[in-house]
């Protein structure tokens, strides 16, 4: 970690080219000078350029900034799950609510939050008047944070003021890729675990010769630190911004014995400098991304059936649209190719896309051919049926030998749905005979009023007494009618 007293302004010298990994695109470097490194991250309503910022956060060893923003649109389900924030409406008012604490979050409008962010950056730069500007550090596999920030600034006419202070964006993902090559995922959480484990191993080796009391106190301190890190929720932009700075600092000082020295920040800047670029390059890329967005939207009718099925096929549709747009294709261009050369032309056009596998290319060719050909029906994605339904699993008795069913709790019997699940599961199947509860091992239910009550006995005895004391029946004689005579 970095001590608060360390000044984050370091003179950038010539970059060490040995830290750049082979195969990583190295852009035009930032001119040499004194720069302030600030880690930045955002929470958004989604992962599209048309989405909005929900939280804007920045971190330095000496200061930090965080502000929630009230968006016009709601967060999509994935964003709500990741950030644990949702939009609620009370009357005519909309507000943000935390799904962890169930409390209302104080938020501002986007223009007010951006103004506060620019004021904070200007104040940070004014504390170091000899600096040449600020470099914003972020960490993500696919570049998205700079585009969202720049687009919001362009929307409110604040880009000129922003470029006077901020000189570059730099992605620490490239640094992680060049520093740690034996891992599959380069997420902040995974990198933090790897670096923490390496730090613990080094500390354990150094403390082998210490006393038992000292080692026990050190282990307790490490456990408390790990528990604190587990409690931090990385779905928040403020937590990720701090984690981005600390992870990048440790990656650039893997061989350093004093990671909290002023030399550590110098190593961090020198390691990141090959991946920096002037802010004007990001603005141009934003314009290109807007063109790509229009191309992606043109493919919406093609992948309409994909978006109506499972999440897996929706993700594949998004991937296909992005790849086609980045390679300069839109629906009109591919339609012209199919009109001229049919399916063979589509196959030849997609062969140049190196980021797609052979089976993905074949799937795209068949899908586009079925869409353009009026004699064919647009292909629908194949959905694999589930093996066993959940209802069948619930109805199937699975008793272990020697274990009675009476020991099972109500939650095991009816699931987490409570009374609702119990009422649903108690409905018998009309196609089968309802099993007896005794045969299934359940406790037999006691019938109501199974014991004759005293009141019932008295009523029955009174009825029998009345029947016995009744007088005998009287037999009436049979009268014979007599006919009258003259």
Swiss-Prot record:
Organism superkingdom: Eukaryota
Positions of the UniProt region annotated as Disordered: 202-233, 386-477
Biased composition (Polar residues): 420-437, 464-476
Coiled coil (UniProt feature): none
Keywords, ordered alphabetically: Developmental protein, RNA-binding
Cited SUPFAM superfamilies: Ribonuclease H-like (SSF53098)
UniProt-listed Pfam families: Exu_RNase_H_like, SAM_Exu
Biased composition (Basic and acidic residues): 218-233
KW Glycoprotein (keyword) present: no
Protein name: Maternal protein exuperantia
Native source organism of the sequence: Drosophila virilis (Fruit fly)
